[in-house]
Amino acid sequence: MVRVEGDRVLVETGTLTAVIEKGFITSLRSRRTGEEFIRPFDVSQEAALQLLYRSWDLVQLDDRAPKEGEIRCLQLSPERAQVVFHCWDGDGVIEITADPDTGDLIIEPSAYGSRPGVVSCRWVIRGLREDLELVAPVKQGLRLPLDDPLIKGSRWEWPMFWEAQLAILQGDKSGLWVHSQDTRFRYKALRVGSESDAHALGLETEAYGPVEGNLGAGGVAWGVNVYDGDWRVPAARYRDWLWKAYDLAAEERKRPAWLPTITLALSWCPTDPDLLDALAQRVPPERVLLHVPNWRTDQYDENYPAFVASDEGKAFIRKAQAMGFHLAPHFNTVDMDPTGPVYPLLRDFQYRDLWSGRLHGWGWADGGYLSVPESNLARTKHRDKKVMVKIHPGLAMWRSVLGESILAAAQDLPLDTVFTDVSLCVSNLQNAMVEGMTPAEGMLRLIRDVSSLGDGLAVGGEGLNEITMQGLTFAQAHLLTEDPEQLKRPYACDLNQFLWGKLCRIIGYTHCGGQSETDRLVRAVYDAQGAIPTLTVDSAEEITSPTPEVEEVLRKAGR
């Protein structure tokens, strides 16, 4: 039931009752228990519907004086209502329905103005009870109070940083959650906190870039519901939807049989044959996954997409294969060296930032980061500074060039597993659409193209989200923080591995050397997130004469 009563919309489903005023949910109760999840707040403090501009200006669609406006409720049918906004700086609609099967309250916001440059439409859920903790697919799973300094005021773009389109608010033995079932690769963002309330969430729908002339955004529906139990209850429902929406049962059948048997991973593994002998003394090789970055004739992060094995790299790979190790030489997804011969063929399809218009990528010199040169000439002259640009994966020509190069290496060595770097780089862009695909959709297509090369390849990646996990077998996981003091607080949870660990497992990315207190704290984070125990070592001696931390990892992996 969705019913308008004056300036309020009342909603009743099989699971909840809700009251909506001026676009805000001002009451959300469990029908089973009567538990209320929203505390009282002043709906006039800020607007429920907002526009975010490319300049980072946030415009409120409200009716506060002196910028007077009108916000009214409209009954369209017994099961459908709208909150209509006619305000000083823009207009908008919040569509309100209910799902009779799930009991979800469905909210679909949209807004626009005459001023160009709109990036997103934001709908705000305010007044969340202060005991509720955010459980979110950010950096492979976090659980923190909304006002925690690690996340307060933060904004996470889907799917690169907000890795699945859901957010869970966990109480003692119950909670509420919000999610989308969008399958059109619509860009979104999650804002933690609002202008007037730390205990709030902002749910954004972004327009595809370019946005310089864009006037509005919308078109994504958000489902809100309550639940009994812990966060795994709504997460399981979302996982079930994922499996059906993307036919992931078929993807499960493609994963290698060795994936669940891996008990140890080495990130950034050196090509030292003695290291293989030392590892084999502690852990059966068939249970070890090696990420090998420096196996080519070229230096690391230079001359992509050229993948030619050096004699040293080839000897290491063949010895590891003969011993039974699973190894993944380091390739890439979208990075390429602009000093290379294929750059002129692809230059028109480089990633450009949605906000600044600058080229995505980097250079590296004197131990520090450099931006990509904006001189077309300079970009082609500085291999010594490891300049890399990113080519949109929606471009079929790029996937062809990359695939041909990876296939040649895979057949030469030969390989059954590869690691593809920067697969997490799938954000909205100034040039978001190439050949009808966003970077997110294009990256999934690229990963699947690589996995189908030759007789088939298991593909690893950097970072992991609900799009790339559909094609990846394993992925390096980035940390929310590397600050030792912040790491002492148990912020991590295994939400992401709960969602898709059957398809793709995570391994450590950094601080896996077991040499410091920071390394120990990082291992606790990765353990909490369900990662494969991971080491980063420089020599065989670190295995034969391990620190206590390394010894603990080896002992568990070898059991």
Residue ranges and their predicted role:
Residues 286-295, 401-432:
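Active-site groove signature of glycoside hydrolases
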Residues 318, 329-408, 483-502:
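Active-site-adjacent "subsite" loops/lids of carbohydrate-active enzymes
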Residues 260-358, 363, 397-404, 441-447:
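Aromatic- and glycine-enriched glycan-recognition loops and surfaces
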Residues 1-5:
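Short, Gly/Pro- and small/polar-rich lid/capping loops
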Residues 10-289, 294, 310-315, 319, ...:
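Carbohydrate-recognition beta-sandwich/jelly-roll modules
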Residues 316-325, 408-416, 449-458, 529:
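A structural motif corresponding to the C-terminal end of an alpha-helix
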Residues 271-272, 296-301, 334-339, 425-430, ...:
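Flexible loop/turn segments at secondary-structure boundaries
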Residues 204-205, 213-219, 223, 396, ...:
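Active-site-proximal substrate-binding groove within the catalytic cores of carbohydrate-active enzymes
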